Amino acid sequence: MGRRIQGQRRGRGTSTFRAPSHRYKADLEHRKVEDGDVIAGTVVDIEHDPARSAPVAAVEFEDGDRRLILAPEGVGVGDELQVGVSAEIAPGNTLPLAEIPEGVPVCNVESSPGDGGKFARASGVNAQLLTHDRNVAVVKLPSGEMKRLDPQCRATIGVVAGGGRTDKPFVKAGNKHHKMKARGTKWPNVRGVAMNAVDHPFGGGGRQHPGKPKSISRNAPPGRKVGDIASKRTGRGGNE
C-alpha cells in the first residue's frame, strides 16, 4: 500500500492546506449608497493586506464609516474619493458602468449589481469598458474575455495599484517561503515523477517519466487520480 498522495492529504483539510483567513483584513466590497446619492470619503492610510497582492486604501466617509477599498494607481493619503451614480470620472471613484464613459479603464467590477466587486482585483490589472446601452455593458477583462454585464454593476475607475510587482525577483527561496506562508499555500510542490514509487503513481524508475498513460478516468480512486483527468484529448493536436 502506497502513501497518501498530496491530493488526498489536502482533502483532509489540515492547517497546512488552509488559508489563514483570520489574518485577512477585509473583503473590499463597494460601499452601498442610496439611489441617486453620492457620498465622499478621504483616504487616511495605505495598508498592506496579506490576502492580496495589491495595496488597500483606508477611507473615512462623511458619515463616519471607515472601510478598506482596493487602491487604484495615483490615489494617495489625503485624496477625496466619491461613491455614487453622479460621482466624478476620476481614479478611485466608484459608480455604475452605465455612468462611465466607454474606453475608461476600471477595476473591482461587479458581476451582478450589489455583489461588491468580483473582477480585475489583482495588482496592476484593469478591465476596460468597451460599450454599454440600456440593457447591457460589455467589459473586456484582463484575460481578454468579453463579459456582458448589467449596466447597473458598479466599478472603480482606474488601474489597480502595485503594477510591476512581478518584475522584482524573489532571489532567495526564503523570500518565496514567506510569501507562500502568508497565503497559506503549500510550497514547494514536488513533481510526481521526481518521487519514489511508494509516494506517487508517476514515481520511481531509472529516469523521470510517468511510466503509464497520463489519461485517467473521472471515476478513478483518489490515490490514482493524477495526470490528465477525464481528458478528451492530449498532446499538441493538429488539423481536425
UniProtKB/Swiss-Prot annotation:
GO terms (molecular function) for this protein are: rRNA binding; structural constituent of ribosome
Question: Which consequence is recorded for altering residue 200 to A/G?
Answer: No incorporation into translating E.coli polysomes; ribosomes assemble normally. Significantly reduced translational activity
Xref: SMART domains: Ribosomal_L2 (SM01383), Ribosomal_L2_C (SM01382)
Q: What GO biological process term is on the record, naming one?
A: cytoplasmic translation
Q: Which UniProt keywords apply?
A: Ribonucleoprotein, Ribosomal protein, RNA-binding, rRNA-binding
Q: Name one GO cellular component term.
A: cytosolic large ribosomal subunit
Query: Region (Disordered): which ranges?
Result: 200-240
Q: Which PANTHER family does this UniProt record tie to the protein?
A: LARGE RIBOSOMAL SUBUNIT PROTEIN UL2, RIBOSOMAL PROTEIN L2
Family classification: Belongs to the universal ribosomal protein uL2 family.
* Assembly and oligomerization: Part of the 50S ribosomal subunit. Forms a bridge to the 30S subunit in the 70S ribosome. Interacts weakly with protein L37Ae.
> What function does this protein fulfil?
One of the primary rRNA binding proteins. Required for association of the 30S and 50S subunits to form the 70S ribosome, for tRNA binding and peptide bond formation. It has been suggested to have peptidyltransferase activity; this is somewhat controversial. Makes several contacts with the 16S rRNA in the 70S ribosome.
What's in the misc comment field?
Answer: This protein can be partially incorporated into E.coli polysomes in vivo, indicating it can replace the endogenous protein.
What is the protein named?
A: Large ribosomal subunit protein uL2
